Regions:
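A short, conserved, highly charged catalytic patch centered on acidic carboxylates
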Residues: 1-135, 142-176
Length: 176
């Protein structure tokens, strides 16, 4: 099964991801026959259970590979569908990477959204504000946006995010 078949007919795009990452994900896909035809699944790297592949889930699973392979984050420091509370309202952040020292504090929040930039950026910022996470990432598979929450309600654009082995203070001192 090709990932392009799963996203066909949508506005999703996988141009942010390498051929190697796409092939790695495609090799993990299994088809389950149902009365209405076939459905495609894979075992999630973080949840360690089989999940149905939707276009948004394809982008999320590919971005997990980026976080693991390129940025060296451990799946043990990640949670998917992390609950974020706003008063009595509860929402779910797509991917959360927890702080190295304070393992219950969100460090990076990643939102994977439909292919319209504004659809998720404000939501991502609200999640960062609600949790105190200093880094936010938004992606739809074609575009990506990295943000640093400098002060509450003030975000600056970043060109990359820190790797797992970088302290935030060192990351910011080196890049300038």
């Amino acid at each position: 099964m090709k990932l392009t078949d799963i996203i066909k007919g949508t506005e999703y795009d996988l141009s942010l991801f390498s051929d190697k990452q796409i092939a790695e994900l495609e090799n993990r896909i299994v088809e389950r026959k149902t009365n209405g035809g076939g459905k495609y699944y894979l075992t999630c790297l973080v949840r360690k259970k089989e999940i149905k592949l939707t276009p948004e889930e394809v982008v999320r699973q590919l971005y997990l590979l980026v976080l693991i392979e390129d940025y060296r984050y451990s799946t043990s420091k990640m949670e998917l569908e992390y609950e974020v509370t706003f008063g009595r309202e509860k929402k779910r952040a797509d991917i959360v990477i927890f702080d190295k020292q304070d393992t219950t504090a969100p460090f990076i929040i990643v939102e994977v959204k439909k292919p319209k930039l504004k659809d998720g950026k404000e939501q991502l910022k609200s999640y960062c504000n609600a949790t105190g996470a200093p880094i936010g990432v938004w992606s739809n598979g074609k575009s990506i946006s990295y943000n640093h929450r400098n002060d509450p309600y003030y975000f600056e654009d970043l060109s990359i995010i820190p790797r797992a082995d970088q302290l935030l203070s060192v990351f910011f001192s080196v890049r300038w």
